[in-house]
A protein has these predicted regions:
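GH16 jelly-roll
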Residues: 1-123
Length: 123
């Protein structure tokens, strides 16, 4: 579900060609760094072109390195970017025990949105 085109990694969603072993109707490409990379401060910069389609949900999430030790929601999750369908915005959200179990989402704000260029690259 991916191609390398002119030095760009292109992730795709495709109709599942073999539903005998996996019954989901569609399969998608993705990058999973679970147990491969941990970040301790600093800046993470990602350049991505976000296509639009019904049902599309490209996302970039940060989760705990030791997820078994810190399960969701206590370990938290930072949604760096989620783009839905044909929206001209991306969503940024923080999930945690504070926001999920205690339902405190406004002080401080749980998330925000920002404009994107659906036809171009976004950083």
């Amino acid at each position: 579900c991916y191609d390398l085109v002119d030095g760009n990694l292109v992730l795709k969603g495709l109709i599942n060609p073999d539903r005998s072993t996996d019954t989901v109707p569609y399969i998608t490409g993705g990058i999973y760094t679970k147990y491969k990379r941990a970040f301790h401060g600093g800046r993470l910069e990602i350049k991505a072109q976000l296509g639009c389609a019904t049902g599309a949900w490209p996302a970039i999430w940060l989760k705990p390195f030791e997820e078994a030790k810190y399960p969701w929601p206590s370990g938290g999750e930072i949604d760096i970017m989620e783009h839905l369908n044909y929206d001209s915005i991306a969503y940024q959200t923080v999930h945690s025990t504070y926001t999920h179990n205690l339902n405190i989402k406004k002080d401080p704000p749980q998330g925000s949105t920002g404009p994107i260029d659906p036809a171009g690259y976004n950083v």
